[in-house]
Amino acid sequence: AGAPRRPSGGSQLDAMAREVRRLYPVNASKQVAVETLRAYLFGPDPQHPRPFQYDLDDPMGTKVDNKLLSTYLKTKKGNCVSMPLLFVILGQKLGIPVTITTAPQHLYVKFRGDNGLWFGVEATNGGSWAEDPWQEKQFPTLTPRAIASGIYMQPLTRKETATVIIDSLLGDYEAHKSNEADEARIRL
């Protein structure tokens, strides 16, 4: 008999989504669902004594591997790429209307509430609410012109979010001197 087989990233994410889903009522509002996901990821609670947290050893995400979801799942320490991506992946598996949005050199989550309005969620800050005025204060280079142009603070489509993920992966390929980065660019 060999070593026990570890679940793939996909099955691990599916298992996490099932675990979160069991924590809130079937007919719960979107608000209850997103609050439950926040508590699950960033706790702490008795079932999750070691919640996911910001990686203070690499706060700027300079080590490319630290931007990868696989690293975040393994270490439970992430940054402004891996943390919102996990939140969005699990949220979408749960049917919660969440997506990625951007600020200068930063990603965070947008959640569409029961009232149809979008709300910011800052995964790097324990899943706290992060409305646009708060984000504007955090990023002095976030100009009204850039916001008006739609470059920042707009909910991204799935395709735009995929581009953000690919950008992180290309950095990983390049860091490991892999020719897969060139192949990936060609396929895009």
Which role fits each region the language model picked out?
Residues A1-L188:
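A structural boundary/capping signal
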